[in-house]
């Protein structure tokens, strides 16, 4: 992690790595999904939060765990 990294970068290093190197995340409501957060890459959606995940902190923790595994499997 770069020196002077923010609290977000320390709490969610795989989310940061994802958006800097592999894809992007979308947050909020849209017309196509009822999820709160989605992770995408060039091929499309790779993950979306469950409808019943109501807190952003819980969703980001779940996304962090998913991206840690995905980055290890596909990009390591």
Task: Describe each PLM feature range.
Residues 1-24, 45-47, 73-76:
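Negatively charged, low-complexity tracts enriched in Asp/Glu with abundant Ser/Thr
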Residues 8-19, 36, 40, 63-70:
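Extended hydrophobic/Leu-rich segments
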Residues 26-27, 59:
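N-terminal targeting/docking segments
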Residues 27-48:
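Short aromatic-glycine-(Arg/Gly/Cys) micro-motifs in beta-strand/loop hairpins
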Residues 44, 52-71:
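A short, charged, amphipathic alpha-helix used as a generic interaction element across diverse proteins
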Residues 30-32, 72-75:
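Generic detector of bulky aromatic hydrophobic side chains
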